[in-house]
Design a protein with these regions (language model features):
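N-terminal leader/targeting pre-sequences
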Residues: 1-39, 44-151
Length: 151
């Protein structure tokens, strides 16, 4: 049973993302039914404030821990990464991730963002590669909230 959900219902992006606690980890399942062509960076951001052009109020990528973290690849990657770095999505379909040492409840009120461009996973030569993956502007955003099953 999912504990948290984020719903994308924008003109260019449609989909549901659920977060289910599995022991000390959280299973993330994203199902997109509409997505622009190409690869898009996909991240959990710190805040659920979607005000402002391009969801600027969502702040930076979410990172659990005392250090700010460095941008990186998918959950489970051996390279350093922000807790909220989910790599790239491309096309409609289902994407699944397991994020270790995190609960769905820690994500309540945060946001999910789909970016315009591919995430370089922190491997690029651009100035923002180690903070945002040089993934471009924010094209869709959704707040992560409690599911009715978790009430």
């Amino acid at each position: 049973m999912p504990h948290a959900v984020a719903v994308f219902n924008m003109r260019n992006v449609k989909g549901d993302v659920t977060f289910t606690n599995k022991g000390a980890n959280v299973l993330v399942e994203a199902i997109f039914t509409k997505l622009p062509v190409g690869e898009h960076g996909f991240h959990i951001h710190m805040a659920g404030d979607l005000r402002g052009e391009g969801c600027k109020g969502a702040c930076a990528h979410f990172h659990k821990g005392s250090r700010p973290g460095t941008h990186g690849g998918l959950p489970g990657s051996k390279r350093p990464r922000h807790t909220g770095d989910l790599g790239n999505i491309s096309g409609t379909g289902t994407y699944k991730y397991t994020i270790r040492d995190l609960s769905a409840e820690e994500l309540f009120g945060r946001s999910l963002i789909v970016h315009e461009d591919a995430d370089d996973l922190g491997l690029g030569n651009e100035a923002d590669s180690l903070t945002t993956g040089h993934s471009g502007r924010r094209i869709a955003c959704a707040i992560i909230g409690r599911t009715m099953e978790s009430c």
